[in-house]
Structure formats: structure tokens, C-alpha cells
Amino acid sequence: MSVCTGALILAQLRLLDGLKSTTHHECLDLLRELAPATEVMPDARFIDNGRIITAAGISAGIDCSLHVVERLLGSDAATKTARYMEYQRS
């Protein structure tokens, strides 16, 4: 899982080739340049490709992290985690 510009590192390692991805809105063009074989999704808060997940920015990373909690532990665990954090999920 990458958050914000962490996707640029994944791009340089060619781990995003053939996948959809996102990053911070100010780095979308750089992501396209570094990973021409990825489909950049500029309006997505996060993209879950199964084994690789990319999140657009810091607050999107919170939504993405709660998504991972939900994927691994279920919806109830993600809801309880968000409530504990006093975070309103997108």
C-alpha cells in the first residue's frame, strides 16, 4: 500500500505496470511519466488492485487504511476503528 507520492516509488520499481493507480493530485503527471504502462485515475481517492493499493493523499490514505481493515477484518472492525478515531469515512 502506498499513500500520496509513495506511488512514485512503486512506479519506478515498475510495480504499477498494467494496473490502475493514483497519487497526490500535484504529482499525477509525474506518475504518468514514470509509469506509462499504468492507468492513472486522477479522481480516485484510492485504488485497490488486490496486491497493490495506491492512495491519493494523506486523508485518502486514512480512507484507504480503513478499507484495508475492512478487507482483512470485516466491515464492523473498520466502522469501529473509524469511530474510535472520530473519523467520518468518505
Locations of regions flagged by a protein language model:
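Active-site-adjacent pocket-lining segments in enzyme domains
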Residues: 1-90
